[in-house]
Structures are given as structure tokens and as C-alpha cells.
């Protein structure tokens, strides 16, 4: 799917994924920098912080935490110690079947990441009939839209994926049984809407609004388009 294609930005033809974190504030830009190192050390897997341009240019107060890095046992790392056991790190094995077994171990690790590292934020979803799904700047805009629509008696809420991989498919599927429709907002032509449709499995209609070329959706246009779907 589209967002999962983004996770393979480093190129290559192997069966792998990157952990992808999508910040929605300056605070999260700071926090995710530390988190990404912890996750990459824990799983020996690359992590991408996928921020849009608006977040990158934003000025906000943030709290610098006293967070101490988690120590992770890394038996694969070189220590430089005298008389240590030799440790050769390779990604390609010529022996028949060896590379496939290595790839099976990687797939097992990716399944563990999918089970343990899904991150998302739920906003006013307790009684929502329409669910926005958005990340980054688009998610911030949707919160303002939700407050305005609720003032008009239209019950809306937001599911914000924080991890674009692993994607919060299961929670989207569960919430799809409780709502009437989904409205995806992005600052592109629709890179996540495909994942949302796959997650909800045709339980409810999925609508989309996006702006391209650095354009930012406005509250007015989101509300206008959403009302056309009701």
C-alpha cells in the first residue's frame, strides 16, 4: 500500500520495513529523535521520522526531558575488546538456504515490531459518528475542525497514526464498527488513504481530502467537503 511504500525509501529488493514515526508537534520532533535511536537499537532496524514541511518550520515551546537512554543488549555490536570472539556482520550469504533462514528471522522480528510498536492518538472518539484519520499538520487541523463541527452538533473524532509503520490497522478496524464513515485528510494526493481502506475492509465509506505542492487544507474546505458526505 502507499504508506508502506514510503517505508521502503532506502531502496532495495529485500523483504524489510522501516519503523516510521510521524510527529505532529515540535515536542514530538524532539521526543521521537530519542525514541528512534532506542527503537533502532532494540530491533537493529532503521527508523524514519516522517515530518511534513509545516512541522519542520514551526516554532513552539518544548520540554527538554532528562530521559536517559535505554541500555539494550547488543550481542551483534563490536566491542573492540582484546581477545573477543570475532563477529562478522553480513547481509548476504552464499550457502544454499542460509540467506532464506536469515530472512525468516528478519520477518519474525518485523512481526514482533508490528505487535509491540503500534502508536496512535485517539481524540474525542468516544461518541463519534465520523472519524477523521490524519497525521502531522493535517491532524492538528482536524482537531480544530472537530471542535467546530461538534459545536454544530456533528459528532466527529480523530484517529491519528503516530507510527505509519507499523500502521494502526487493528484499532481502525475496531472503530469502523462503531462509526458511520471515515474522512482522511492529508497534505498530498492520498498516500495513507489506501492503508485506511485496507484497514476498515469496506465496513464504512472512506472519503478523502488532500492538498498538494505544499498546500495546507483549511478548516472551511474540510468542513464543506465533509458535510457533502453526510
Feature locations, PLM:
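Short, solvent-exposed amphipathic alpha-helical segments in soluble enzyme
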Residues: 34-39, 64-67, 144-155, 173-177, ...
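Conserved thiamine diphosphate
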Residues: 1-52
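Peripheral docking tails and interdomain loops at the edges
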Residues: 186-230
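Redox- and metal-dependent alpha/beta enzyme cores, enriched for Fe-S-associated oxidoreductases
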Residues: 119-155, 159, 165-171
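Conformationally flexible catalytic loops at phosphate/diphosphate-handling active centers
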Residues: 44-122
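Glycine-rich beta-alpha junction loops
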Residues: 51-57, 136-138, 189, 213
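Short acidic, glycine/serine/threonine-rich loops at helix termini
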Residues: 1-2, 31-34, 58-65, 144, ...
